[in-house]
Design a protein with these regions (language model features):
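Short Gly/Pro-enriched turn/cap motifs at secondary-structure boundaries
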Residues: 133, 148-151, 175-178, 190, ...
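A short core secondary-structure module
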Residues: 170-209
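A short, charged helix-loop
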Residues: 224-250
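Short glycine/proline-enriched turns and hinge-like loops at secondary-structure junctions
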Residues: 83, 152-154, 178-182, 219-221, ...
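N-terminal glycine-rich flavin-associated loop
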Residues: 104-124, 150-153
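A short, Trp-centered hydrophobic/proline-enriched beta-strand micro-motif
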Residues: 136-144
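Flexible, small-/acidic-enriched active-site or ligand-binding loops
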Residues: 155, 203-232
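Alpha-helical interface subdomain recognition
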Residues: 1-98, 108, 120-125, 132, ...
Length: 397
């Protein structure tokens, strides 16, 4: 008869609760594939890319990510991989363990631009854009946020007006990931009939995009301002099925889902760096892992990662089974990003002065997560979304 100890599995420091046990062999294989690509193509270079604020051969990297099906991987058909929500979440976790900027490239492409076309676009839109976007040979961006409009998209100032059978767009969008490298932009604008979405090829006359400089976060990600000055589009450019805020908000929920997984990757990488460093760093004649306060920090970080992983998996399974409520995504995004940011800050204290060096991943992840906490819904907005669900009382104004 086997003893209890023979049934025990080896503990994973960042997964003490055993989320890994609840994954299928295929899901683990997806995770391993993405991790291997990140270790080969991203990890050796990411510190330098972050420091310089530029990725070497970004088009080439996009094609390599497209080869393993990362763009729109949870969408069906049109060259997309058609994988599960959990598969996609695990991929986001591995990508963000390398860098939030790389995960942003993938999630904006797949969960915002491609999802908008796949869910709300015409068949012509899907056939024209999605195969190239899935392959990474065409890049998309998503224009919703404006210089003076963030959490309240209903107040957007970008306008689309009819001119004969055409639409003419005027306005600007701000903090747009992939904007100045995009081949196509999904632009949301106010019309006489409410907010509508448009598929805008970036070669269209009157469209321009300027990269935003002097960032201290997401430096390995392209962030841009979009300018639309008399951008003339045919009537077919409109997303036919997206009327009102339902369209853009559904896209944001897709992106938030990837974020709630991805943030755990950044937290995991920072925790692992702190654990490894603490085991090697000697003070007062012993490794600092032997001190109670260090152990308390490591334990707290590990427990938060374990809880966050189980939460992400529960949300992912609900999404795959068609029973996910949007509020649950807000719960995951709020909890996991906040926890990951706290983990990075705690890990930095363990590394001491080395914690601010790009020779280690911690300060890079910490800076990145300051942005992740804000985009696709601030922590305050997600708090109010959850609060309304609990009380039935909206408190947004």
């Amino acid at each position: 008869m086997m003893t209890l100890s023979e049934h025990r599995t080896e503990l994973i420091p960042y997964d003490l609760a055993g989320m890994d046990h609840h994954l299928t062999a295929d899901e683990r294989a997806v995770r391993s594939t993405v991790r291997a690509v990140c270790e080969e193509l991203i990890d050796p270079n990411i510190g330098d890319w972050f420091e310089r604020g530029q990725i070497d051969d970004l088009p080439g990297l996009a094609v390599e990510l497209g080869k393993i099906g990362l763009f729109g991987m949870h969408l069906q058909g049109y060259g997309c991989a058609g994988m599960s929500a959990v598969d996609y979440g695990l991929a986001c976790m591995e990508l963000e363990a390398s860098d939030s900027g790389i995960r942003s490239l993938v999630s904006v492409q797949g969960s915002l631009a491609m999802f908008a076309i796949h869910r709300w676009g015409s068949e012509e839109h899907r056939e024209h854009w999605l195969p190239a976007m899935a392959a990474g040979t065409a890049i998309g961006c998503f224009g919703l946020t404006e210089p003076d409009v963030g959490s309240d998209p209903s107040a957007m100032k970008t306008r689309a007006r009819r001119d004969g059978s055409d639409w003419v767009l005027d306005g600007s969008k701000m903090w747009i990931t992939n904007g100045s490298i995009a081949d196509v932009a999904i632009v949301w604008a106010g019309t006489e009939d409410g907010i509508r979405g448009f598929v805008v090829p970036t070669t269209t006359a009157g469209f321009s995009a300027n990269a935003i400089r002097h960032k201290m976060s997401l430096r390995a990600s392209v962030t841009s301002e979009l300018i639309l000055e008399g951008v003339r589009l045919p009537s077919t450019a409109m997303l036919p099925d997206a009327v009102g805020l339902r369209g853009p908000l559904s896209c944001l929920n897709e992106a938030r889902y990837g974020i709630l997984w991805g943030a755990l990757g950044a937290g995991r990488a920072s925790f692992q760096a702190a654990l490894d460093y603490a085991g090697q760093r000697t003070q007062f004649g012993r490794p600092i892992t032997g001190f109670q306060l260090t152990q308390q920090k490591l334990v707290d970080m590990s427990i938060e990662l374990s809880k966050g992983g189980l939460l992400a998996l529960a949300i992912g399974r609900a999404k795959d089974e068609g029973r996910l409520h949007p509020v649950q995504v807000s719960v995951g995004k709020l909890n996991n990003v906040r926890a990951a940011l706290d983990i990075c800050r705690t890990a930095r204290t363990i590394l001491g002065a080395n914690g601010i060096s790009l020779e280690y991943p911690v300060i890079r992840h910490m800076n990145n997560l300051e942005s992740v906490l804000t985009y696709e819904g601030t922590s305050e907005m997600h708090t109010l979304i959850i609060g309304q669900a609990l009380t039935g009382q909206p408190a947004f104004q």
